[in-house]
Amino acid sequence: MEAVKAKKHLGQHFLKDESIAKDIADTLNLEGYDNVLEIGPGMGVLTKYLLAKEVTTYVIEIDTESVTYLDQNYPKLKDKIISKDFLKYNINEIFEGKQFAIIGNFPYNISTQIVFRALEYRNQIPEFAGMFQKEVAQRICEKKGTKAYGILSVLVQAFYDAEYLFTVDETVFIPPPKVKSGVLRLRRKKDYSLPCGEKLFFTVVKTAFQQRRKTLRNSLKTLNLSDILREDEVFNLRPEQLDVQQFIELTKKIEADGI
């Protein structure tokens, strides 16, 4: 079968550099789980290196042309190709509560959505690695006090240790994207349970950063906090001045306030 044609509406940019594909596959430590799910494998440049490892590899691909290509060229993937949209698919139809890692050269147009979707399965995902638009990868790994630090940074780092590994040039893709890419690795924290309400924590973080230039006293007005609580010194700060632990402590204070 001929090579798959990259489809713009799917955000496809096929990696052609074998050494980079191998490096991405090697970011997984493969401990504590027996299954790996690759999102958006395309023509399998990364897949071949995953299949060589001592884990069971599944792939999920929305592009039917790519699915046909994988089926014809990778016999080891027999019964392990999921022709679905990752953002809508119930992963436990295949993993049934088991632990698995996620990896991929993620489509730029939905990469952030992929991360948020993966967070929903964090109890089953001890490790997550792959390639994003460089700016997105940096945002995920960013620490407090910078413009890039935001919702994605806090919510991911509440549950995972995030590490930016290396930058990838535009020229190693077909077609080349307009921006550089970045590879990162997330490893789930040993204790990743939140000592506060999860739903409220997500709400506090998202609400705070929606008006990131304002102090928390102003950005969190919609939560209807008591006047006494709003006098706490933390409300003089802007959201990018709080690290993950401080957001957790803030959420606990809001809980105690009766929210």
From Swiss-Prot:
EC class (word): transferase
HAMAP family the UniProt entry points to: 16SrRNA_methyltr_A (MF_00607)
Chief site of localization: cytoplasm
Compartment annotation: Cytoplasm
Record organism: Flavobacterium psychrophilum (strain ATCC 49511 / DSM 21280 / CIP 103535 / JIP02/86)
Domain of life: Bacteria
Protein name according to UniProt: Ribosomal RNA small subunit methyltransferase A
Gene: rsmA
NCBIfam families (UniProt xref): ksgA
Top-level taxonomy: Bacteria, Pseudomonadati, Bacteroidota, Flavobacteriia, Flavobacteriales
Summary of the function given for this chain in its UniProt record: Specifically dimethylates two adjacent adenosines (A1518 and A1519) in the loop of a conserved hairpin near the 3'-end of 16S rRNA in the 30S particle. May play a critical role in biogenesis of 30S subunits.
Similarity comment text for this entry: Belongs to the class I-like SAM-binding methyltransferase superfamily. rRNA adenine N(6)-methyltransferase family. RsmA subfamily.
One Gene Ontology term of the molecular function aspect: 16S rRNA (adenine(1518)-N(6)/adenine(1519)-N(6))-dimethyltransferase activity
Coiled-coil blocks: none
Catalytic activity: adenosine(1518)/adenosine(1519) in 16S rRNA + 4 S-adenosyl-L-methionine = N(6)-dimethyladenosine(1518)/N(6)-dimethyladenosine(1519) in 16S rRNA + 4 S-adenosyl-L-homocysteine + 4 H(+)
Residues that coordinate or bind S-adenosyl-L-methionine: 13, 15, 40, 61, 85, 105
A GO-annotated cellular component: cytosol
SMART domains (alphabetical): rADc
Protein keywords: Cytoplasm, Methyltransferase, RNA-binding, rRNA processing, S-adenosyl-L-methionine, Transferase
Enzyme Commission number, as recorded: 2.1.1.182
Database matches in InterPro entries: KsgA/Erm, rRNA_Ade_diMease-like_C, rRNA_Ade_methylase_Trfase_N, rRNA_adenine_dimethylase, SAM-dependent_MTases_sf
